[in-house]
A protein has these predicted regions:
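Hydrophobic membrane-insertion alpha-helices, especially the h-region
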Residues: 1-15
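The canonical Cys-X-X-Cys-His
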Residues: 40-51, 102, 124
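Stable alpha-helical elements in mature extracytoplasmic
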Residues: 32-36, 43, 63, 67, ...
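C-terminal region of N-terminal signal peptides and the immediate post-cleavage residues
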Residues: 12-24, 53-54
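Acidic helix-start/capping segments at beta-turn-to-alpha-helix junctions
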Residues: 54-69
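Extracytoplasmic electron-transfer domains, predominantly the class I c-type cytochrome c fold
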Residues: 65-111
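C-terminal capping alpha-helices of c-type cytochrome domains
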Residues: 100-101, 108-133
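Electrostatic cytochrome c docking/interface patches
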Residues: 19-40
Length: 133
């Protein structure tokens, strides 16, 4: 037990995952209406925008490492906060939502408001397809 606490304490010294940055929003995605924008914020923006709401567990290793990695990868793939109508990955995002890959189940287990119904997924897919550059 003591050894486990010592290891847990030592994990907190690893600096990766400490820094939680939300760069400025340059250009937000053009959602067709506020309801779809809210749906996207709930299901996508934690990892795919510069508007991440960093939960408490994202400050504690090893979860901080996983959350930081997910956000970095998500922003690299598709970032709704630096939207470029000519160069975006909306078609890939639509496919991922349609195939049930996004949002991932490991995320929706902790954030049930991001778990999309079939109708919500269809609405989000249609909006993403309409925004494809």
């Amino acid at each position: 037990m003591l050894a486990g606490l010592v290891v847990f304490g030592l994990l907190q010294l690893v600096p990766y995952g400490w820094w939680h940055e939300n760069p400025p929003v340059v250009a937000d995605a053009p959602w067709p209406d506020e309801a779809t924008a809210e749906l996207a914020r709930d299901a996508c923006y934690a990892c795919h925008s510069n508007e991440t709401d960093w939960p408490l567990y994202s400050y504690v290793a090893p979860m901080s490492w996983l959350v930081r990695q997910d956000v970095e990868r998500g922003r690299e793939e598709l970032n709704f906060s630096v939207w470029d109508p000519e160069d975006n990955e909306a078609d890939h995002a639509a496919d991922a939502v349609e195939d049930g890959e996004m949002p991932p189940s490991r995320y929706t287990r902790l954030h049930p408001d991001a778990d999309l119904s079939d109708a919500e997924a269809a609405r989000l897919v249609a909006a993403l397809e309409a925004m494809d550059g």
